[in-house]
Amino acid sequence: MKLVGTRPIHTDRLVLRRWSVDDAQQMYDNLASDTEATRFVTWPPHPNVDATRLLLTGWVRGYDDPATFNWAVWLDEVIIGQIAVVDVDTRVNLAELGYCFGRRWWNHGYATETVKAVMSYLFDIAQVNNCLLYTSDAADE
């Protein structure tokens, strides 16, 4: 695996880019404060925008490490989600992905489009051999 870090990715409808602490309000409003949207992520729903700002501060610091792969997902000028490599198994060159999208953007194919783009990036640029992604039927409930 090549440790190339988080670079911008463009799809037909979306832009994936690094997080900024300035993204805190949108992240909080659009997904981080929603108990349903955050039900399956590794961090709890945020009680206020300060909690989101604190999380983003850590994520932004993490970009100093080229093993960090963590994107904000943008539709036009709006943050609609997040996707990241949450674990790496170097023995088998495997990257595990996790993602979260605001409920307003469920069932429009944005998660599928995002996952495909990130998997292409990981296979082609970072030279990962395998990707693992757990999904749920939460959007269908």
What does each model-found stretch correspond to?
Residues 134-139:
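Conserved small/polar residues in nucleotide/adenosyl-binding loops
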Residues 107-121:
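Conserved acetyl-CoA-binding loop-helix of GNAT-fold acetyltransferases
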Residues 38-41, 71, 132:
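Short, hydrophobic secondary-structure boundary micro-motifs
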Residues 125-133:
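Conserved GNAT acetyl-CoA-binding A-motif
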Residues 24, 45-96, 104:
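Acetyl-CoA-dependent GNAT
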Residues 62, 121, 125:
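Active-site catalytic microenvironments for nucleophilic, acid-base chemistry
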Residues 1-54:
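A short, well-structured alpha-helix characteristic of acyl/acetyltransferase catalytic modules
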